[in-house]
């Protein structure tokens, strides 16, 4: 099933549909389930796994609430991806940011945010991905 995106909230069923797209995409590019679980946890907290979610009262946008939306737009421009509103495009941007390819990373320069979790040692059964 294709992405389901809305400016507001998506239902649990719609979020589950989108979660399966995320799982299938990141598995297809070789991400371990533990990494996928971490990414999806962030997406769920930020947008409900909704690629078109607009931040209420703010300027965040998309699966991981890029703030302001121009950060996502600029990353897409640098990477030659479009449209920025596409869930598939946003999935491609995230690893590029994490690896800081093309200097598009958007977060504080501290290892405290990702290094603790990058090689956590968690196994797939510990994170419960079944998609």
What are these regions (language model features)?
Residues 40-41, 56-131:
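Catalytic and binding regions of secreted/periplasmic enzymes and modules that target cell-wall glycans
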Residues 8, 12-77, 92-96:
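Secreted/periplasmic proteins that engage bacterial cell-wall peptidoglycan
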Residues 1-8:
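Short, intrinsically disordered N-terminal pre-domain segments
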């Amino acid at each position: 099933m294709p992405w389901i995106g809305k400016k507001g909230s998506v239902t649990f069923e719609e979020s589950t549909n989108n979660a399966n797209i995320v799982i299938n995409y990141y598995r297809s590019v070789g991400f371990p389930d533990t990494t996928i679980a971490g990414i999806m946890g962030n997406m769920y907290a930020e947008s409900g796994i909704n690629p078109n979610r607009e931040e209420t009262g703010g300027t965040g946008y998309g699966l991981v609430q890029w703030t302001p939306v121009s950060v996502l737009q600029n990353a897409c421009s640098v990477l030659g991806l479009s449209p920025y509103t596409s869930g598939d495009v946003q999935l491609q941007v995230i690893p590029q940011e994490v690896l800081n390819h093309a200097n598009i990373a958007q977060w504080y320069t501290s290892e405290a945010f990702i290094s603790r979790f990058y090689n956590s040692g968690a196994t797939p059964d510990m994170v419960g991905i079944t998609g």
